[in-house]
Amino acid sequence: NSSRTSSAASDLHGEDMIVTPFAQVLASLRTVRSNVAALAHGAGSATRQALLGTPPQSSQQAAPAEESGLQLAQETLEELDWCLEQLETLQTRRSVGEMASNKFKRMLNRELTHLSETSRSGNQVSEYISQTFLDQQAEVELPAPPTEDHPWPMAQITGLRKSCHTSLPTAAIPRFGVQTDQEEQLAKELEDTNKWGLDVFKVAELSGNRPLTAVIFRVLQERDLLKTFQIPADTLLRYLLTLEGHYHSNVAYHNSIHAADVVQSAHVLLGTPALEAVFTDLEVLAAIFACAIHDVDHPGVSNQFLINTNSELALMYNDSSVLENHHLAVGFKLLQGENCDIFQNLSTKQKLSLRRMVIDMVLATDMSKHMSLLADLKTMVETKKVTSLGVLLLDNYSDRIQVLQSLVHCADLSNPAKPLPLYRQWTERIMAEFFQQGDRERESGLDISPMCDKHTASVEKSQVGFIDYIAHPLWETWADLVHPDAQELLDTLEDNREWYQSRVPCSPPHAIGPDRFKFELTLEETEEEEEEDERH
């Protein structure tokens, strides 16, 4: 069936390429219906006229066999129409999404196995992607709890430290919420707030290292959300400065610059034409707030590191999305500070709705959930295609939050789709953070996590692998959802991939054409694998 089988030479962006199981079922049923109609069409003039909606001129002239065939054809078509109607209106998020997720994981595992066999560095990239994005952890031998000079007390896990900001303006609110003697330069930089590729590093430099405060202050004003939700400017400013103070400036990547970048990226994605007027003001506010708090109080190590070292956080959150749960707890806890409740004028219903959405969005930033999120998004995109809805119709919470979760996840993984100078800075920062974790693991006698060993990691190869297996499939699917709005981002991503590929030591000649990206969501599983899955 053409809906289920794809040629290796097929175009990566082919319109008719359908790979998620649920969308394949719909396409297959449509083909069956079309075939039945065509077969019945040839049964005779009476059948043909009936199928076309016009009665035969003389039903008495029809032979009994033809009458029987006509009745069977009509009943079959009615059954198929009913099935299609049911399937098209089915909420596909859960079990159907799981089907696609499991399929994608099997496909990616095959690709990663091949990659790991190519070289030692290839094996490390493969292990990193598998452990980080596939929710698969190797068996580890847990050490005794390490002795630390300053172990985290339970009190700190639940939230507030003493106020970290040195001063709060009591009179006039600064134009961008931050005290700076470079306000004009900052204003010029923030003119790009609505554009993809804002130099958030420059914003950090010009705002006294308060990029998160400056960016959110600007974004909320740009969207007129302070007025919509009656958020007092002084309350917003106090909360933002407190929130930003709970990001660790000594953490190379997961600091307030990253948070500001994710907020601004999400702001741009929310403004894409395909999503115009799709989301309510409350949903937009929830998305911006989720991005703002999504990495607050990040210690610069991974969830698995916290689990392996028996940390208090892992204990509190039962090893499940440890950091993401902590970011949420801190972000909401800070609202309880003096004059920090930016949601004070929302109704109880609005507060509960916003909280639910923020929790769902931040928990979805756990990278181990990536494949499930991608599978859900891909299924949604393909289902919309095969049901010919044409426009993005999100008429239930499950669909709406799914797109918002994907949007925040895309913003969180937007570095490779940014202009190369920005992408390179982010790469340097994430590798510095990884290597710092690796050093801690080495000192503690732990196995060093993939990509965290500064002596063996290949930075360039890791970025090519990250784009091929994670970023490109995600951004390609997002681009399908908002087509054609994100084509420029996809082009940038592919150009950046080529730049890093050209710098891989002893790299082979560039692959061209459809094989350029090693992992494509168009791979077909063999019958043997399908049978093996059924046995398990």
Swiss-Prot record:
Q: Which residues bind 3',5'-cyclic AMP?
A: 254, 463, 466
Name the residues annotated as catalytic in the UniProt entry. 254 (proton donor)
What this protein is called in its record is 3',5'-cyclic-AMP phosphodiesterase 4C
**Protein EC:** 3.1.4.53
Which residues are recorded as binding Mn(2+)? 295
Binding-site residues for AMP, renumbered to this chain: 254, 258, 295, 412, 463, 466
Which keywords annotate this record? cAMP, Cell projection, Cilium, Hydrolase, Magnesium, Manganese, Metal-binding, Phosphoprotein, Zinc
Q: Which organism is it from?
A: Rattus norvegicus
What does the record give as the function of this protein? Hydrolyzes the second messenger cAMP, which is a key regulator of many important physiological processes.
Pathway, per record? Purine metabolism; 3',5'-cyclic AMP degradation; AMP from 3',5'-cyclic AMP: step 1/1
Q: What is the reaction catalyzed?
A: 3',5'-cyclic AMP + H2O = AMP + H(+)
Belongs to which family? Answer: Belongs to the cyclic nucleotide phosphodiesterase family. PDE4 subfamily.
Could you say which residues bind Zn(2+) 2 here? 295
Question: Annotated Gene Ontology MF terms?
Answer: 3',5'-cyclic-AMP phosphodiesterase activity; 3',5'-cyclic-GMP phosphodiesterase activity; metal ion binding
| Binding positions (Zn(2+) 1) | 258, 294-295, 412
